[in-house]
């Protein structure tokens, strides 16, 4: 059963995806100076779900929609767990204006599925993303998933520019 909140979150995420498809990952001019916008990226992730008490693997796609904003759709699978559980996420990540831009916060929509049952909810997360000068960017984050059961996850992974 889809609640009104879930439907609203889905509409917002779909709208952001439409806006994000026209964004170009290149230098933009702001006030007479060039501003670097990250390129889209893709990468693997691993983590641990403390509520489910199980490790998971997955991947994500990073789609910059602005100088500090990134749309991050991702999928996480729980190998070896009963019922073949998985989670699909559509998150929006924000890098606040800090000295090096390592820290980020965000939130979004979560769809959870296990043994024929599904649930929709929301994510809130904060994390650290490595230096942008390398050919890849490592990250680590803590994520709260608010659905039928609230869970806390610790995740880590790499992002490779496309």
What are these regions (language model features)?
Residues 41, 45, 104-106, 125, ...:
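Short glycine/serine/threonine-biased micro-segments
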Residues 141-145:
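C-terminal binding/interaction regions
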Residues 150-162:
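Outer-membrane beta-barrel "beta-signal"
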Residues 10, 15, 20, 106, ...:
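Small side chains
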Residues 35-39, 50-54, 81-87, 115-121, ...:
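Transmembrane beta-barrel outer-membrane domains
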Residues 1-35:
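Cleavable N-terminal export/targeting peptides
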Residues 58-138:
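Gram-negative (and chloroplast) outer-membrane scaffold detector with strong preference
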Residues 24-67, 71, 77, 94, ...:
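Short glycine/proline- and aromatic-enriched beta-strand/turn motifs that initiate or cap beta-hairpins
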């Amino acid at each position: 059963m889809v609640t009104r909140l879930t439907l609203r979150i889905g509409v917002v995420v779909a709208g952001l995806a439409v806006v994000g498809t026209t964004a170009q990952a290149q230098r933009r001019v702001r006030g007479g100076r060039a501003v670097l916008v990250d390129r889209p990226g893709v990468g693997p992730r691993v983590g641990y779900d403390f509520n489910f008490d199980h490790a998971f693997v997955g991947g994500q796609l990073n789609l910059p929609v602005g100088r500090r904003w990134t749309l991050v759709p991702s999928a996480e699978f729980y190998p070896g767990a009963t019922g073949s559980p998985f989670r699909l996420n559509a998150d929006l990540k924000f890098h606040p204006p800090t000295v090096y831009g390592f820290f980020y916060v965000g939130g979004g929509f979560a769809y959870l599925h296990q043994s024929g049952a599904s649930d929709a909810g929301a994510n809130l997360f904060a994390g650290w993303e490595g230096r942008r000068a390398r050919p890849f960017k490592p990250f680590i984050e803590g994520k709260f998933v608010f659905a039928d059961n609230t869970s806390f996850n610790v995740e880590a992974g790499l992002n490779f520019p496309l």
